[in-house]
């Protein structure tokens, strides 16, 4: 199981760095910050499916 530590999030601004992550919602997030902000918004229901594009 792939795990990302989102304890430092949410953050108001994300970098434009591209390191894609695939969420459990089958959406590709451009980087950890975008993904972790979405995890916080989902109240923890969103999880990481795998690293890379969906």
Swiss-Prot record:
The record marks 16-17 as: Reactive bond 3. It comes from the Eukaryota. PANTHER family: OVOMUCOID-LIKE-RELATED, SERINE PEPTIDASE INHIBITOR, KAZAL TYPE 2, TANDEM DUPLICATE 1-RELATED. GO terms for cellular component: extracellular region. Keywords: Disulfide bond, Glycoprotein, Protease inhibitor, Repeat, Secreted, Serine protease inhibitor. Disulfide bonds join 6-36, 14-33, 22-54. Avian ovomucoid consists of three homologous, tandem Kazal family inhibitory domains. SMART domains: KAZAL (SM00280). Pfam families: Kazal_1. Residues 4-54 form the Kazal-like domain. This is Ovomucoid. GO terms for molecular function: serine-type endopeptidase inhibitor activity. Glycans are attached at residue 43. It is found in: Secreted. It comes from Gyps coprotheres (Cape vulture).
